[in-house]
Amino acid sequence: MRLLRSSRLLAAVLLAACAGLAQGGDLVVIVSARSQVGALRPEQVAAIFLAQAPRFPNGAVANALDQPVGSALRDQFYLGVSGKTPALLKVYWSKMVFTGRAQPPRELAGSAAVRRAVAEDPALIGYIEREALDPSVRPVLLVH
């Protein structure tokens, strides 16, 4: 009885999570309009955001900015570029921090804050909803 109830609860949670991701539109990975960085592949973006690559492919320093933990946009982004669920991401960063190898990207309050920060600094990279694009930033990857 308890197992059946737990299974139903898990199924409901997974269904809600999938529905939330399906409702989300496209998101874009952005750099400053002043940046010399060209288009990036998903694996290059994942390497930057997972602290495996400290530089853009052109050699310039790369500093990632994240959306808040628990946001649908963040979950969609990491699933799209790295295949990591929120649970796997938490485990990954726990290991990286515990071993002293890296710290997770700095979190900002939302897409507007990420866009403003990225626009001001060519070393920054972030992700926002496609609809939030403006001329101050340039998309380098579209994530479905």
Residue ranges: model-predicted function:
Residues 17-19:
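N-terminal signal peptide c-region/cleavage motif recognized by signal peptidases
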Residues 1-11:
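Bacterial N-terminal signal peptides that target proteins for export
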Residues 25-144:
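Exported/periplasmic ABC-transporter solute-binding proteins
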